[in-house]
Structures are given as C-alpha cells and as structure tokens.
C-alpha cells in the first residue's frame, strides 16, 4: 500500500483549494453566459481575482452565532463537512502512482466517507435551533437514503465488471475499453444520483431559497458560511474525479496517439474532471428544481429498481460467457 509524504499531500490539497475557488468563478461565468449577462468582471482581468476578493470579504466579516444555538456543534459542523471532502480525496488517483493512499478497498472507503457528509448537514441544521435550518437538514437526510442505496448498487455493478475495489486498478482495467461504454445507462444514473447526494441543482431541495431560506446554513456567516460552500464545491470536484475514474478511463489519454502520450496523465485527468464539472454547471443552468415528491419518487421508484435490475443481468452475462475478471 502506498502512503504519501506531507509534501505530496500539500501538492494535491492546495490545487484542490484553488480549484474550488475558481470553480465558483467558472460557475458564475457560465451562468451569466447562459442568462446573457457578463458576470463578475471588475476585480482583476476578466474577473479572475473575484474569488480572492470574495474570500477576503468572508474572512473579514464578523462571525455571528444565534443566541439559542449549540455553539460547539454549530462551529464544528461546517469544519466537519469540509474536512470530509478533503479526506475522501486520499484514494482518487490523478495519474499512475499519483495518489495519496492506494488501499485495496479504496472505492468502499470513498463510498463510506461520502456517506458521512450528511451528518455535518444534520448537525448544522439541528445546532442552529432554527426551523428553516432544521427543515433543510431533514430534507437532506431524507433524500440521501434512496440515492445512497442506488449508488451502492451501481458501484457493485462496476466492481463485478472490473474485479477490484482498488481505485488505480479500476482505471487500469479500462485500457481496452472505457466502462462508460458498456455501462452507459448505469453511469448516467450514477451521475444523477451524485447530483442528488451533493445537493446540486435540480436536486438542491435542502437549500431551496423560496421555501427554507437557504436551508441548513441559513444561520451561518463569515468563515462558517465559507466552509459550507467550500465543502459543497470540493464535493463536486471529488465526485467529478470519481466519475472520471469509473467511466472515461481516468488518467490515460482520450485517443491512443503518440502525441497524446507525451501529455502527463494528470493533465488528461484534469481535462476529464473539468468536463464533468461543466456538466454540473450546465445542469444547474438548464433544468428547473424538482418538487420534493418528484425527487423522492425518482430515487425510490425509478433509480432503486433500475440499479437493482442491472446487477443481475450484468452478473449473468459475465458468468455465462466466462468473462469474470
């Protein structure tokens, strides 16, 4: 098992933090383009320094806590949400050998850590002692259950085809053909389920502004609010990295050409992650928010039966034709 040294840890975490900052800027730019606006363009050339200005503004703001809140849990919740998104990055391979830790249960570790994110949201809503924050937290917990089960069944389908739970071995198994080609319907369900799990549009019911006034983080200000948003966007990058490892082959080049092999694998991995992040933003710009009953019905009545129905035929085909890895 490969264990990273502190320098390598900083080499991956610092780009992640910068990526989160500029992902917010990219989302604002894309949303502005879709709505025929300019977007942020005042701070720096083309607004490139806008994330720095927003960060300084949040740091300099006075942190205000509700007088009736549970202060220890209230302060701990956004930190826990952000730290979980960082810890989960440990098993995502950026290139051959470029991974913080490469255990044989990497995919299960990632699934377990991502499932813990809901606790930070529940604690934030409950400790705020606000009915709007608590309503947003309850919505998040309720919508996580059916989609978590669907995600688990989809991952089982991929594991059966690959024969390994190691993240790097899953990428290496896609040298001949991307798993996203034969398992395309499964991976579409996986991406949509990840939208619901990360509370992104059109499934952002926990923070529906018109109903629950920004949801579980309505009482947060200053760095508490900043850490909540950092955790959300870090989870977007994490899930895009996971989708890249599972479907479009991870770090190998898109085309098997001599000139493509000269480009580092980490660059190819980053390009594929950026494409998934653009898909996140495009979905937010293009689709309206689901009603809560539609969200729950999609998870329980559509995705759960379909993901369960895919495990059996895929297993049967692999056993019948002796294609088990």
From Swiss-Prot:
Catalytic reaction(s) noted: a ubiquinone + NADH + 5 H(+)(in) = a ubiquinol + NAD(+) + 4 H(+)(out)
Membrane topology label: Multi-pass membrane protein
Highest taxon above the source species: Eukaryota
Keywords: Electron transport, Membrane, Mitochondrion, Mitochondrion inner membrane, NAD, Respiratory chain, Translocase, Transmembrane, Transmembrane helix, Transport, Ubiquinone
Listed InterPro entries: NADH_UbQ_OxRdtase_su1/FPO, NADH_UbQ_OxRdtase_su1_CS
Cell compartments where the protein resides: Mitochondrion inner membrane
Positions of transmembrane segments: 5-25, 79-99, 105-125, 144-164, 177-197, 237-257, 263-283, 302-322
Keyword Transmembrane helix: yes
GO cellular component, one term: mitochondrial inner membrane
Top-tier EC class: translocase
Biological process (GO), any one: aerobic respiration
Any one GO MF annotation of this record: NADH dehydrogenase (ubiquinone) activity
Enzyme Commission identifier(s): 7.1.1.2
Keyword Transcription regulation (UniProt): no
Main location: mitochondrion
Cited Pfam families: NADHdh (PF00146)
Family: Belongs to the complex I subunit 1 family.
Known role: Core subunit of the mitochondrial membrane respiratory chain NADH dehydrogenase (Complex I) that is believed to belong to the minimal assembly required for catalysis. Complex I functions in the transfer of electrons from NADH to the respiratory chain. The immediate electron acceptor for the enzyme is believed to be ubiquinone.
Name recorded for this polypeptide: NADH-ubiquinone oxidoreductase chain 1
Taxonomic lineage from the root: Eukaryota, Viridiplantae, Streptophyta, Embryophyta, Tracheophyta
Record gene name: ND1
